[in-house]
């Protein structure tokens, strides 16, 4: 009996020791996890203050139609770059008109298209939204782009992108024809041309900076939900009856997206709306911009005239000039901004540019 009692006491002691050890171990893991979460929170809070490392190394790939280069096709040059690329790759494109559709996938960041000048180097195609794709279905707008970029840190310099589909008349269906679609983050464009009619430039998503570019079209020829600055660009309308420059797709007030046109020139034919509320909380600002006498009465359009977007959209102008400038303030819900309210849209901080745009490029 005594031996049984001793055995039971021993088993109880061992069980108690295991119980206490288990709970101590659980407490330790909980403490480590809590500390880890705290550290993660601090890392998240300081994420935007960390120095960007960028790509490692640089490589140049050449393209020429005459065969005196590594590739004859821009797409072939893109395809030669490995997935998950971590080098800065410049694709140097010789003068010529490259008739092809080009896609830069999300797995290939840090690519630059460098042309010999926007008047002599161009990539062009002719798809429309109503055209049929390989699956027998209509392409729809976003798939018509002559060039589509999904990758981050894309750059284009001194090159043009064109959709050669003919311009539609107002009200014609299925004639959307995109020249360029940018869906990647932190993209930079300098000295580029974008040529089309309806929906020329699909500024789809991400932060983008366009400097000294020429953008031509007729209806909503800059559209999407990007967070983009257009600095010292020419926005040229080829509208035959009426047209519109920008249609922004911001859908909720928490989004930081918007189009900021700073120091631009608006030229061409009209009458022309300077902005349309594609999204319920569309956001478009013009500052220090010249307007030809082509702005439509009212200046702005709320898209469908039944969603009360005029109450939620943010359309603003600051220090604009030219014979058409007064018309940009033609509706009560277009805001005449003062410097304080305009400043967030006229500095490159609007696109967090200090972290990824070189000072010489700003």
From Swiss-Prot:
Active-site residues, record numbering mapped to chain: 199 (proton donor), 220 (nucleophile)
Q: Where in the cell is it found?
A: Secreted, Cell wall
- What keywords does the record list, in alphabetical order? Aspartyl esterase, Cell wall, Cell wall biogenesis/degradation, Glycoprotein, Hydrolase, Secreted, Signal
Gene3D superfamilies documented for this protein: Single-stranded right-handed beta-helix, Pectin lyase-like (2.160.20.10)
Q: In which pathway does it act?
A: Glycan metabolism; pectin degradation; 2-dehydro-3-deoxy-D-gluconate from pectin: step 1/5
From the record, what ranges are coiled-coil?
none
Tell me one GO molecular function of this protein.
pectinesterase activity
Q: Which residues are glycosylated?
A: 37, 86, 158, 308
**Top-level taxon in the UniProt lineage:** Eukaryota
**PROSITE patterns per UniProt:** PECTINESTERASE_2
Q: Name one Pfam family in it.
A: Pectinesterase
Q: Where is this site: Transition state stabilizer?
A: 198
- Any one cellular component term from GO for this entry? extracellular region
- Which residues constitute the signal peptide according to the record? 1-26
**GO BP annotation list:** cell wall modification; pectin catabolic process
Q: Which reaction does it catalyse?
A: [(1->4)-alpha-D-galacturonosyl methyl ester](n) + n H2O = [(1->4)-alpha-D-galacturonosyl](n) + n methanol + n H(+)
Q: What is its EC number?
A: 3.1.1.11
Q: Which InterPro entries match?
A: Pectin_lyas_fold, Pectin_lyase_fold/virulence, Pectinesterase_Asp_AS, Pectinesterase_cat
User: Binding positions for substrate?
Assistant: 141, 176, 276
Q: In which tissues is it expressed?
A: Expressed in young siliques.
Q: Which family does it belong to?
A: Belongs to the pectinesterase family.
Biological role: Acts in the modification of cell walls via demethylesterification of cell wall pectin.
Protein name per the record: Probable pectinesterase 68
Q: Which organism is it from?
A: Arabidopsis thaliana (Mouse-ear cress)
């Amino acid at each position: 009996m005594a031996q049984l009692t001793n055995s039971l006491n021993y088993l109880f002691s061992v069980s108690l020791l295991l119980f206490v050890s288990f709970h101590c171990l659980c407490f330790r893991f909980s403490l480590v996890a809590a500390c880890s979460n705290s550290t993660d929170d601090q890392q998240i809070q300081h994420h935007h203050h960390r120095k960007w490392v960028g790509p490692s190394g640089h490589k140049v790939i050449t393209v020429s139609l005459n065969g005196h280069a590594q590739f004859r096709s821009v797409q072939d040059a893109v395809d030669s770059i490995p997935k998950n690329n971590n080098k800065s790759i410049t694709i140097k494109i010789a003068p010529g008109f490259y008739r092809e559709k080009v896609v830069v996938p999300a797995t290939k960041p840090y690519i630059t298209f460098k042309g010999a000048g926007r008047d002599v180097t161009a990539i062009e195609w002719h798809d429309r939204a109503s055209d049929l794709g390989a699956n027998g279905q209509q392409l729809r707008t976003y798939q018509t782009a002559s060039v589509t970029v999904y990758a981050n840190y894309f750059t284009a310099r001194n090159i043009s992108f064109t959709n050669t589909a003919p311009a539609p008349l107002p009200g014609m269906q299925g004639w959307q024809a995109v020249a360029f679609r940018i869906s990647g983050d932190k993209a930079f464009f300098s000295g580029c041309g974008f040529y089309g009619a309806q929906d020329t430039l699909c500024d789809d998503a991400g932060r983008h900076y366009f400097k000294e570019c020429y953008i031509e079209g007729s209806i909503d020829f800059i559209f999407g939900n990007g967070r983009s600055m257009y600095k010292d660009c020419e926005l040229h309308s080829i509208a035959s009856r009426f047209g519109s420059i920008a249609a922004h797709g911001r859908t909720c007030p928490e989004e930081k997206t918007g189009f900021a046109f700073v120091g631009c020139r608006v030229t061409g034919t009209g009458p022309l709306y300077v902005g349309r509320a594609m999204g319920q909380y569309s956001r478009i600002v013009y500052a220090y911009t010249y307007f030809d006498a082509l702005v439509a009465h009212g200046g702005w359009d709320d898209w469908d005239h039944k969603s009360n977007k005029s109450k939620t959209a943010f359309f603003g102008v600051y220090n604009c000039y030219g014979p058409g400038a007064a018309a940009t303030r033609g509706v009560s819900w277009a805001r005449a901004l003062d410097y304080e309210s305009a400043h967030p849209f006229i500095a490159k901080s609007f696109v967090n540019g200090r972290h990824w745009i070189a000072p010489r490029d700003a």
